[in-house]
């Protein structure tokens, strides 16, 4: 290799390195969150804990029923939010019941023999009431109180930001023994728009008085974590069952296998910027 070519290569390499060093890094360090908001259903409260009761009522179909119930519940929230400017909005409790009735009807039509003259209520009314009562007081995940207590010790305001209507959330929090551990319990019901509508996520900013970028939002629902990330929150996806994340080109800020991963947002020893 001649000297002129060598000099040219060296010059180009230096120039390239110099230019690279002047390009700003878009991945700026994230500020320590000043508040933490949690999704409720699926994140703090185990929506599939109803599967045991469902299995007792519908032997051999409890797991399938609980999965279909949850999927249809979420589908209904999206349907009433996006259709006809929300004119068909119904409270979350009503949508939860409607989704359960659908799930039972689908399983009954394909798998369960019933009397041809009997109405749905005669055949399944008691089962609907039992499962809805179970949903009022869903099992909480075991690490909830530990994590919320630690955040409280750090002086970090916490809250729920949920599709659930106020009465549902109040009872769920009380049943889980989390009274006094949450600064805010925020329902989308007053705005009549369910997540993932941006107005639903804006409620977190309004309640805390903080911009989304200074709030950590925690959800076990990948679609919820994705939409919250798009909105501007720092996010934690709690991936308890080792599922893939949504394939839409955006990842959550953090991923963990339990609620304890939210504590990774805060240095140790804790440094509270509030």
Place the predicted regions along the sequence by residue.
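Active-site neighborhood of HAD-like aspartate-dependent phosphohydrolases
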Residues: 25-74
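Asp-based, Mg2+/Mn2+-dependent phosphohydrolase catalytic module
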Residues: 6-13, 17-33, 149-153, 161-274
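A metal-dependent, Asp-based hydrolase signature
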Residues: 57, 63, 76-130
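Residue-level signal for well-ordered alpha-helical scaffold segments within enzymatic catalytic domains
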Residues: 56, 68, 98, 102, ...
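Short, acidic loop-to-helix structural element flanking the phosphoryl-transfer center
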Residues: 93-94, 114-115, 123-159, 170, ...
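An amphipathic alpha-helix signature
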Residues: 51, 66, 70, 93, ...
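Hydrophobic side chains within well-formed alpha-helices
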Residues: 50, 65, 127, 178-181
